[in-house]
Amino acid sequence: MKLAIDIEFIRHAMLVVASHRFWMLPFSTLPWLAFQYYVTMDDPTKIIGPGSVQGTLLGVPLTGLGMFFGMRIIAGEIDDRSLEIAYTVPGGCERLWFAKLFSAFLMLLFTEAMLAILVYFLFTPFPLGALYGALQASCFYMILAMALGALFRSETSGLIGTAAILGLNGLLTGFGENQLRFLPFFNPYLYLDASGSSNVVDGGFTSPEELLAWTIQNRIAMLLLMGAILSLGFMRANRREIMLDGM
């Protein structure tokens, strides 16, 4: 019985985040794949290799969707004038926000699975680790959008702040040309693509063991950073008087 109640609560959270047509949102990422497919068909020299799957084909649409979910989790309650109701949820408002996060995560998983199948058959096979890398970036920016939405008490302001940080990420990495292992979009498979056409040193690392160490460092650091941002976002949202001021 408790499982049924929890599932119903998560379903309700999903409806609050993305309305009754939430099932359509994963399909909003398909135009991006269609555009990339058109580009590769129009210019055969623009080949998308396995190393580009994580960022170009999966990471970009998933991150956009994650940012939308993130801005809706807490700031959506403010813009909908329903935040005061969230504070009265049995078990605390965090229970509702965690349910929203989990429902958004499930939608991201479904979207990634759908995109991965299409990419595999329409573009190129790719390593399974690329799925985690793309999901990591989307979850990071989802949590960041949630926290900034709570900080600025606005969906729009939170989204603008998140987009600015995403743009800075793009500038630092040359929009995927350079890989920095302390950023959420770190893609080790681009190094492997580079080393496949030259030598390992030219690919940017000295050994596969070093590349593995960089990848593990990135994954652990991003998990810790996401946990810290999530905690700060909830701390801000729990300041009830400030959050409700002016509503």
Kindly give the residue locations of the regions a language model identified:
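Aromatic- and glycine-rich beta-strand/loop motifs that create alpha-glucan
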Residues: 1-27, 242-246
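Juxtamembrane loop-helix boundary motifs flanking transmembrane segments in multi-pass membrane proteins
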Residues: 1-10, 46, 93-94, 123, ...
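Hydrophobic, membrane-facing alpha-helical anchors
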Residues: 9-13, 18-19, 78-88, 108-118
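Hydrophobic alpha-helical elements at and bordering transmembrane segments
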Residues: 10-14, 96-97, 132, 237
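Hydrophobic H-region at the start of alpha-helical membrane spans
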Residues: 22-29, 58-60, 220-226
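Secretory targeting signals
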Residues: 29-66, 70-73, 98-170
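Terminal transmembrane helical anchor/hairpin motif
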Residues: 43, 164-247
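Helix-loop-helix units of permease transmembrane domains in multi-pass membrane transporters
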Residues: 71-105
